[in-house]
Structure formats: structure tokens, C-alpha cells
Amino acid sequence: MTEFDNLTWLHGKPQGSGLLKANPEDFVVVEDLGFTPDGEGEHILLRILKNGCNTRFVADALAKFLKIHAREVSFAGQKDKHAVTEQWLCARVPGKEMPDFSAFQLEGCKVLEYARHKRKLRLGALKGNAFTLVLREISDRRDVETRLQAIRDGGVPNYFGAQRFGIGGSNLQGALHWAQSNAPVRDRNKRSFWLSAARSALFNQIVHQRLKKPDFNQVVDGDALQLAGRGSWFVATSEELPELQRRVDEKELMITASLPGSGEWGTQRAALAFEQDAIAQETVLQSLLLREKVEASRRAMLLYPQQLSWNWWDDVTVELRFWLPAGSFATSVVRELINTMGDYAHIAE
């Protein structure tokens, strides 16, 4: 399995280095739910500003404040501890007066707004995230500037970031140990983290191998293609290749890569053979996903940061702004720009 730091770069390995997350204020994330609260219902949606707090810690503190079970507090996604983040949490508080959230006191955390909502906020139920990042101590401004232009046009690999695999790859190591020991894992969080890490690592490996090909973004017979911004996909046939290639070139369609698991992968013929060969040696992780009945799915191979802009504060400091769809990683954008330095460059929650 290729380590995250050695996965193929779309625009070649960066020439220079830089500092990511010199302090939490250098990594700002604002959740975009894509909808507004209903204004009624048994749930309460809260928009929370946090600095130096991980999501689970805040959710548990909120549950304690509301005197409800921790499982009654949900969120759409985990957010980095070592960052300034605005995210939505959801608490099930039926048939009660609206609590006085001004009394909710937690260091590094502030409730910005809240409203009633009819439905529980589920994991992944957000449109995307807006990022404002500051990269410092950049050693090669010209190279970074060239890469930013290239990313605006050509995107970046849609890799799962190193955070997905835990500090020092602990989640992936946990998955491997679990697969080899065949021992039951009763901790639901561990199961979720480990299975997610296993499937993400296999996806990254498939994308890594495809990007080695000079014609990586050329549609081949049996590719699974996705309408940009949509979750469903369809299979390319040889008769349609010219027209499908035109639509891929115009970014109307996206070539996808497999999130392996049980059931059909989605690709067929030449494309399926390539994906199977790309992870043929990773039998342990594939067996784990089959054993645990994790359903196979698809994910776009490339990621195009939206609303990308940048501002050089000086020759060694640049501020980046961009928006990514849910499930995509800002660190996968940054790795195409610089070789990152800093204690928190890849740290997970």
C-alpha cells in the first residue's frame, strides 16, 4: 500500500515547502449545509464556532448541558481540532421550551445561532465546506503560483486526506489488525473508523495507479462516469467514448474510482480489470470489507476546488480561499502546492 505522502501528484511533486496550521486561525472551515432550519420540530440545529475543540467533545458537552443522552446529539461531519471551524450540531429536544444557550459555556466554543428543525442531522448531510487557509514560510513562491493556476484549470486528485487514517496511520493499522485477528470489535466508533480507513486507502491506491497513466483522464470502455456534483453514475460503452470524452473534458462528467466493498464495483470490462489489478495485492483489506458487508460505492477521481482565490500577504505567505463538496479534503489540495511542514499538518482529531 502506497503511503499518503507518496501518492501520485497530478501536477508533479511540489518543489518547495511551507507551513500549514502554524496556528488554528490559519485553517478556517465553515460548513455549508445547503438548507436552512425548518423553524419547527423536535430537533434543534445549532451553528457553533469552535477553536481547539474536536467535534465529539463539543457534542458530548452539549448533551450534558441539555441533560440528554450523547446519542441524541448528531453532526454532519467531524471537523479538525486544530482549526477554527463553524459547524452545525443537532440535538433532539422534543416537547421542551427552547433552552437558554447563552448559559452553555465551553472554552473555545460559542453558539452563533440556533433554530428548531424537523429532522435529525445525519452524518454526511451537508453540501460542502468553505475553507480559508494561510500557508506560511513558503520557500518557492513562483512554483506555488504556477500550481495554483494549474489547480484552477485541472483540479487535484480527490484523495482521502491523511486525517482519514488517524494519527500515524492508526486507523488503517487497526483495520489491518482486525482483519488478520478476526476478533470481534464491539466499539462502534472503532469499527466505523477502521472500515472507513480501509476503504479510503483502497480508493486512494486505485487513483494513485490511474494517475500514473499519461492518459489518466481518458474515458475507457467500462468506466463509471458521474454527473458533476451528483452521486449516481453510469457505465461508459465503447460506442459512446468520443461524446463522453468531450463531456469529461468540459467537466460535465467525472471519471470515478471504486470505493471497494461487497457487491458490484460499478465499472465493467477494461475499467474493472484496471481497478482490480490496482489493488490486487491488498487482499487483507478487501476481505475485511467483504466480511463486514461494507457496500461498494464510487467517488470522483478528480476534485475541482470551487471559488478558488488567493492573496499573497508577502513573498512567503499566501491566503487561500475555496469551497469543496462534502467528503473532500483541503489537505489534498494543499499537498499539490507545497511539501507541508508543521506539527499539525496531517494530524487528525
From Swiss-Prot:
<dbReference type="InterPro" id="IPR011760">
    <property type="entry name" value="PsdUridine_synth_TruD_insert"/>
</dbReference>
<dbReference type="InterPro" id="IPR020103">
    <property type="entry name" value="PsdUridine_synth_cat_dom_sf"/>
</dbReference>
<keyword id="KW-0413">Isomerase</keyword>
<dbReference type="InterPro" id="IPR050170">
    <property type="entry name" value="TruD_pseudoU_synthase"/>
</dbReference>
<feature type="active site" description="Nucleophile">
    <location>
        <position position="80"/>
    </location>
</feature>
<dbReference type="GO" id="GO:0160150">
    <property type="term" value="F:tRNA pseudouridine(13) synthase activity"/>
</dbReference>
<feature type="binding site">
    <location>
        <position position="329"/>
    </location>
    <ligand>
        <name>substrate</name>
    </ligand>
</feature>
<keyword id="KW-0819">tRNA processing</keyword>
<comment type="function">
    <text>Responsible for synthesis of pseudouridine from uracil-13 in transfer RNAs.</text>
</comment>
<feature type="domain" description="TRUD">
    <location>
        <begin position="155"/>
        <end position="303"/>
    </location>
</feature>
<dbReference type="InterPro" id="IPR043165">
    <property type="entry name" value="TruD_insert_sf"/>
</dbReference>
<comment type="similarity">
    <text>Belongs to the pseudouridine synthase TruD family.</text>
</comment>
<dbReference type="InterPro" id="IPR020119">
    <property type="entry name" value="PsdUridine_synth_TruD_CS"/>
</dbReference>
<dbReference type="Pfam" id="PF01142">
    <property type="entry name" value="TruD"/>
</dbReference>
<feature type="binding site">
    <location>
        <position position="27"/>
    </location>
    <ligand>
        <name>substrate</name>
    </ligand>
</feature>
<dbReference type="InterPro" id="IPR001656">
    <property type="entry name" value="PsdUridine_synth_TruD"/>
</dbReference>
<dbReference type="GO" id="GO:0005829">
    <property type="term" value="C:cytosol"/>
</dbReference>
<feature type="binding site">
    <location>
        <position position="129"/>
    </location>
    <ligand>
        <name>substrate</name>
    </ligand>
</feature>
<dbReference type="InterPro" id="IPR042214">
    <property type="entry name" value="TruD_catalytic"/>
</dbReference>
<protein>
    <recommendedName>
        <fullName>tRNA pseudouridine synthase D</fullName>
        <ecNumber>5.4.99.27</ecNumber>
    </recommendedName>
</protein>
<dbReference type="GO" id="GO:0031119">
    <property type="term" value="P:tRNA pseudouridine synthesis"/>
</dbReference>
<dbReference type="GO" id="GO:0003723">
    <property type="term" value="F:RNA binding"/>
</dbReference>
